[in-house]
Amino acid sequence: MPAPTSTSEIGGPGADEVVIGCASGVAAVNADGGSFLVSEDCARVVLGGNNVTLRVTGASVDQLVVQGQSNVVVAGDVTGLTLEGQANRVQSSAAGAVTVRGDGNTVAVAGAIGTLEITGANNVVSAPGVGAKIVRGDGNTVP
């Protein structure tokens, strides 16, 4: 097998990514635009901003909070995911609980979601299954 040609192939930062540490259990990104990486275990990861790309890889995260507009997040397993805003896209390998407040958000989870709560319109959630769910608003698509 050939050696990786960039650090992004081995889970490290991509050429344009800024690495964010987890100080006192919290990794926070507050920005308008840019690409960021969290790669260490963290109790809480908070993204506040617009047009931000965030990768959360190789890390265990208890709570992932995304606030703002037009953000893109790719994460591994998260215990809880909260989306607040518009037109955000989140992809996760697993999420125990998902809360969406806002409009036009997309959440894709590879595993089943334990609990799902949506307040807003035109949100799309995809997962192979959902335990308990509460959906308020029009035009939402859920499993």
What are these regions (language model features)?
Residues 2-143:
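Extended beta-solenoid/beta-helix repeat architectures
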